[in-house]
Amino acid sequence: MGMTWKKGKLLLARAPKEARAKFVLKIKSLLRAAHAGREKLIFIDEAHIHQDADLGHTWSRRGQRYYVASTSPGLARVTFFGAYVYNDRKVGIWPAARGNALTAIDCLESIRAAFPDDRLRICWDGASYHRAEEVLERARELSILITPLPAYSPDFMPVEALWRWMREEVTYNHCHATAAALIAGADAFQIKANEQSDVIFKRLYVCTGLDPEQEKLRIS
């Protein structure tokens, strides 16, 4: 058997296999509804982006070390909400004080204000504040349907790819001295991304299947 040197890839073994299989059927149904124009399908996720640089490879002169200047912001970070409007191939990114029930409700209200006449469905993960009764009650008041992802299943969240893309463009080998500078970088990235709807559709791929070999490794 041929061997090669590989970097390990994290697999969340506690993800519930049965719930994941059911979600595959659900997401296929939701995508059909979105394609038919019956619902506006929106994926929502939160991320904590550090002001300090994410170090990585880049082109530099041979024989010279490549230095990335850092103002040493330490663990300073900004919480962002990210939205992927599947029907429109558009994304939204905005800062929040933190991820909690209040900011989740603000998110729902902003989404409804942006699409006042659409039948809305939001997919997000099972964070405790997403499941808070006041959040679910506000969603009902706003006539927003909520579909939670299975536990330990970030592979079903396309906004995870948005965060990777944003880090490549905004924090990769670049330190932001202030939160305001990082937020400005995120704003510029959002504008640039929304000029590339085809790239958004490809990069923010919505998972509609499971790898049987991977699912065997889960312990649930």
Predicted feature locations:
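C-terminal anion-handling pockets and recognition modules
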Residues: 37-41, 160-220
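RNase H-like two-metal-ion nuclease catalytic core shared by retroviral integrases
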Residues: 17, 124-126, 133, 147-171, ...
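RNase H-like polynucleotidyl transferase catalytic core
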Residues: 65-73, 141-161, 174-175
